[in-house]
Every structure is written in C-alpha cells, then in structure tokens.
Swiss-Prot record:
[4Fe-4S] cluster binds at residues 103, 189, 282. Pathway: Cofactor biosynthesis; NAD(+) biosynthesis; quinolinate from iminoaspartate: step 1/1. Binds 1 [4Fe-4S] cluster per subunit. InterPro entries: NadA, NadA_sf, Quinolinate_synth_type2. GO terms for molecular function: 4 iron, 4 sulfur cluster binding; metal ion binding; quinolinate synthetase A activity. One of its GO terms (biological process) is 'de novo' NAD biosynthetic process from L-aspartate. HAMAP family: NadA_type2. The lineage of its organism: Bacteria, Bacillati, Cyanobacteriota, Cyanophyceae, Synechococcales. Its EC number is 2.5.1.72. Disulfide bonds: none annotated. This is Quinolinate synthase. Belongs to the quinolinate synthase family. Type 2 subfamily. Pfam families: NadA.
C-alpha cells in the first residue's frame, strides 16, 4: 500500500505575495534557504517551467531526482512522478504542490487488478511504463519511459514473453517498432485519447507544409497520420533539428512553450480535442500553480511518503532501466 500524506508542521505561514514578481522572488528565496530543487515536466504551465531548475520528460526528471544534491525535491508534475523521485531518493523530502495532481493512466491500472493480470502470465517479464503507481512499479521487472521503451524491449531476450503496462497505445507502438509480440494491459491516457482526427485533417489541409509530430500515447489512427513519433523530449529535439518551420503537435500543449522558446522563428499548432473541447490539456498537470509551489515550500507539505517495502521493490525495476540505458549509451561511444 502506498501512502501519500501531507506532513504537518507548526510553522507560521506568511501571506501569499501579492504580485507575480514578488511570488517568484519568494519562491527563489525559499528554494535557496531550503537547498531545494524544482523539477518540472514539459506539461506544466509556462510560468512554472520558467521558474524550474530543470525541465524534462519522465526519463530526464528521473535521472535528475536520482542524482540531485538538494535536500528537498519539489516535483511540479503529477503524483506518480513525485513517487518516482521518492523511490530514487528516499532520504530527500519530496514535495508535490497539489496532492490531487493524479494521472488518469495510472488510475487505469489498479495494483490489485494488475497483480491478478500478471499472475495469469507467470512466464512473462513485466515491463511497465513509468506512468504508473509505486505499487505497480513494485510488481514490475523493468520500468520504461516513452523515450526508451523500444530500445529497452529490444535489449530483452528474443524468446522472452513480455507483458506491457499500463498504456495500450504506447504498447501497440512499441510492439510495431520492435517487432516483439507484447501482452498489453488495456490502459489509456485521457488526454492523448481525445485528440480529434477530423481537426487534425483540417489542420493538415490548411497547412500542407507542416509536419505532424505525435506522442506514442495517441490513438493508432492518429499516429498513422504523423510524420514523426516520439516522447516529449524527442518531439522537442525534432523541432530543433528539422528544417521544417511549421509543426502540428499531437501531445499535451504544455510542451509548446519550450518549442517556441527554442525555435522562435517556427510555428506550432496544437490539435483540439473531440468536438473542439479544451480537453487536450491535462487537468491534473494544470492543478499545480505558482501559489501552490510557494505554499509547499513555505509549509513543507504535501510531502510524499511510500512504505519502505513497496519503495524497495519499486526501486529495482527503475534502477534496472537506468542501468540498461546507461549501458547502451556507453556501448555507442
């Protein structure tokens, strides 16, 4: 069982600074005083990205969490990311600005149901996408991210059956790219499943010179229309090295902030959700705000706590991922 608790203190909290400038200044002061590091995912609001020490995808942020010298990690993302930081750095205080910042994909894979599913396939190695709870990670043999899923699967023995969880769209894409047959848990991301194919086709007609870039959590019919598929960090990298000056982006639009900063002369368009709704934004990622970031540094809560037995079991497949990735990188040099 995983506990996510708010650790109470008797500390008196000052009023919230009244201007954005004062708020950012107060956050910077607290960060220095507490020897804290602020990690932010690409899907966070731009003003949080701008104040973060490091911005990245799940793999990059996992590495930062494992190697930081800070005493306090503030994870501006969702709770499975903060859990991962705590798993890798149990001696650190790990704060999440809003404890309600969950994940529909992680919620789609309850630990008890996953255990029953895994027990039906005892000969399979369990590869779990990092977008899952600590309790599911603890039942896994190897953790992957969308950045490294294909290459990690390719490193596994060819005769080894593989169970992949929890994202079925990513699983299908990994299966196609690797040529490996995967037994796939039927989970999905509420954001990446809501992009409108009709809206995408209209954008392609209006901007025939634009390249469509997509995250592999998208539905297969949308991936078939993409010119390039990759994780958030790889999508960002592609926009920098491509000679194309216009992109249609199929992932959570928070990434557009970094794309525009790194490519000020290029144009980026996000794809609306079905029926033109704004559901292409992750409601959980958007729960974190500068005010909540300041508050968690001021009060040192909410903090992430994980039962040590679960943490130790979850650490093994994450560390295995990091070791496999490092081994491959070393062999390429």
């Amino acid at each position: 069982m995983v506990r996510m608790t708010a650790v109470c203190t008797a500390k008196t909290v000052s009023p919230v600074p009244s201007t954005r400038k004062e708020l950012k200044g107060a956050i910077a002061e607290l960060r220095k005083k507490l020897n804290a590091v602020i990690l932010a995912h690409y899907y966070q609001d731009p003003e949080i990205q701008d104040i973060a020490d490091f911005i990245g995808d799940s793999l990059e942020l996992s590495r930062r969490a494992a190697s930081t010298n800070a005493d306090v990690i503030v994870f501006c993302g969702v709770h499975f990311m903060a859990e991962t930081a705590k798993i890798l750095s149990p001696e650190k205080i790990v704060l999440l600005p809003d404890l309600e910042a969950g994940c529909s994909l992680a919620d789609d894979c309850p630990a008890d149901e996953f255990a029953a599913f895994r027990d039906k396939h005892p000969d399979h190695i369990v590869v779990s996408y990092i977008n899952c709870t600590a309790a599911v990670k603890a039942q896994s043999d190897l953790i992957c991210t969308s950045s490294n899923a294909v290459e990690l699967v390719n490193q596994l023995p060819k005769d080894q059956p593989i169970l992949f969880a929890p994202d079925q769209n990513l699983g299908r894409w990994v299966q196609k790219q690797s040529g490996r047959k995967l037994t796939i848990w039927p989970g999905r991301c509420m954001v990446h499943e809501t992009f409108s194919e009709e809206a995408l086709l209209k954008l392609k007609i209006m901007h025939p010179e634009a390249k469509v870039i997509a995250h592999p959590e998208c539905l297969e019919n949308l991936l078939e229309l993409a010119d390039y598929i990759g994780s958030t960090s790889k999508l960002l990298e592609f926009t920098e090295i491509s000679s194309c000056t216009k992109f249609i982006v199929l992932t959570e639009p928070g990434i557009l902030h970094q794309m525009k900063l790194k490519n000020p002369k290029k144009e980026f368009m996000d794809v609306p959700g079905i029926d033109g709704c704004s559901c292409n934004e992750c409601p959980y990622m958007r729960l974190n705000t500068l005010e909540k970031l300041w508050s968690c540094l001021s009060t040192m809560k909410p903090s992430i706590e994980i039962e040590e037995g679960v943490r130790q079991k979850a650490f093994i497949p994450i560390q295995r991922m990091l070791n496999m990735k490092e081994t491959q990188e070393a062999s390429e040099h």
